[in-house]
């Protein structure tokens, strides 16, 4: 063998070995490492306590882009919120420590943390910047989601008929700021958020709102998904009695969400929209046949599943039985669309030094127990691979 042939042989062998390393890395990035795409940190609210009091005392200068009617509505809501209990200070990085411990218990490698959907002046409201210390502390584990404290209030406070160029420009500027901050998803946004207790919040804005359309365009442009909280309602209906009893904020009737939601999905097919809390149904229409119909019709729709504790076993359209095994009708749906389902436990992780002390994470526990009961291939896809692709992790 000539020296030249020996050299070629050595180089070829090296490339084969290197290729094997690359292949092994690509196989192991998500092996055993799941992803939760929807988590919150309890205790962040305290960071805003002093600032919130100042903001609540501001007038229309707080949001100069808003039309007069919207500012008046916001002022009325501000007065209501001022009467509600303020949240004591807490430490969100301590809650992040607790979240990491929760994740380690189930082999969850990464979690997306984001503010819940908010309205301006709500007690406990906070911006995405309050999460940056936690994300910085765990850069390989915690991923930033943003918009619930900035974009969602703009949508909720602006009547669709009052949207103008000034509002559109302000919304776009804030969305671009969020993208540049490193966020991997716009969230948590809401089209219909029912109030579940006196300290909860009712929020509703049609999914075909001009600002939702703009958000879809921006999501497509910057290649990041939208995280959406919404009840499934095909036609206008009276509010269920249990919701009226749970919270006085819920109106006597609820407007249909699904027709407008489909218009949002059709508006920009390049916008990935992840419908959160599938398995947490407060109306009764979030059924497997409906999900199948929508997934088949809209290729840019994705679902994030959430399990519920046994104490809430009467909840409608759960995805699992009392042993946290996926029900046959839901398993059939998952097997039909294995690349369109992710996991979002929707838990508020709370450390011991945060208001109220340590909080047992029931939704996180039961959601990931349910994932563990999936068939292996489906578990791998739904538990992590889909999220890595959809959220560009």
Name these PLM-found stretches.
Residues 8-17:
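Bacterial N-terminal signal peptides
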Residues 18-23:
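Sec/Tat signal peptide C-region and signal peptidase I cleavage site
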Residues 25-37, 42, 46-55, 60-110, ...:
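Mid-to-C-terminal alpha-helical segments outside catalytic/metal-binding sites
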Residues 201-343:
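Catalytic pocket-lining loop regions of alpha/beta-barrel enzymes
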